[in-house]
Amino acid sequence: MLWAFNRPAKALPTMVHLGYTNCAVCHISPQGGGLLNAYGRSIDLAQSFRGGDYQPSTNKFVKWLSWDDRITQDVRNVTQGQLSTATDEPTIGTVRARFMYRNATELGKGWRLSAVVNGENRSVKRPNLSYEPPIQPEEVYLTSALVSYRPKSTLEFSAGRDPLPSGVNNPDLTTYIRARNKYGYYDAPVQLKMFWWGKHYQINPYAFGPSGTEPTGAKESGGGSLAEFYLLGKHTTTVLGVNTLHGEASTLHRTMVGPYLRLGLRSWGILAEHDITNRSLTASPTSFLQHASYAQLFWYPREWLLISAIGEQLQTQRPFQEHLIAGRFEVTSRFSNHITLGVTSRFQENMISSQFAPSVALQLALKTVQ
């Protein structure tokens, strides 16, 4: 069984819990999942066990490194120890460590350069499927390199290499909705995308092409669009959206439609997504459907403590028939804006072979704060 560590923090439940409808409130990039802006850094500290008011550093050397606050950057480390097993297989212990450097440089007049560089001791590829092979990663890997232009506060254009926009935008890229739809750790195609958002909506069309790291036959080009709408209510945050995508490679064509929901009710909330993907092989008339489902119920008993129960299901039609279900229970504690500790218990069951695969993991995430 393959299961890997998440990104360092559970930013998405925090966003929903606090009543924010989109990522642009706290993140430099409107796609989210990246560096925090000044307001986001204040929320990051306030929602931790340490608490307090965020104050940017006044150290002269730090100011020099940040080019007088034009550069936002951080260094992150996520280390995970995991014990996993499966039916008729031994227990395996693994330790994975990932280092990440992220940089966003404001050039003025709305222009921005950004990049993310990763290093790791053990790669975590998508499942090696005959019809959709994974990218073979290197020890040091560039997952994002973008030029962005924001002509107004609610409109941004970006070009370069980056993960594709996704619905729920779950930070765990090993979930079925991510790993089985080419949203893995190393899937970072070249793309041109637009973000346009307002109080009640966000529209995100995009076009993409191969980055050059894909296996032969899997160099995919295509386009898609993400659209979501916000239904605001008293003490309630409801976001309904859909992500559509069509991609073509020399060996495979695919079309995906994925409706999703983000619901927040004060201290608890729900994240849900169901992706339907139709794939057709170019060398034969074969086409087959895939259904991938994700649902997360989360609760904040304290601002710094997140408890989640997660359920997943994957069904793929013949000739590549699969039926997997998975469940997970997570407890994540944000001790400060530098330190996050998480404990996870997970199982996966193959409904065709009856193989049962449980695992437990302890994860420590560390980061610098500018």
What are these regions (language model features)?
Residues 79-82, 124-144, 152-230, 239-243, ...:
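Surface-exposed coil loops of outer-membrane beta-barrel proteins
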Residues 220-317:
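Detector for outer-membrane/organellar transmembrane beta-barrel domains
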Residues 52-87, 91-93, 109-115, 157, ...:
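Transmembrane beta-strand segments of Gram-negative outer membrane beta-barrel proteins
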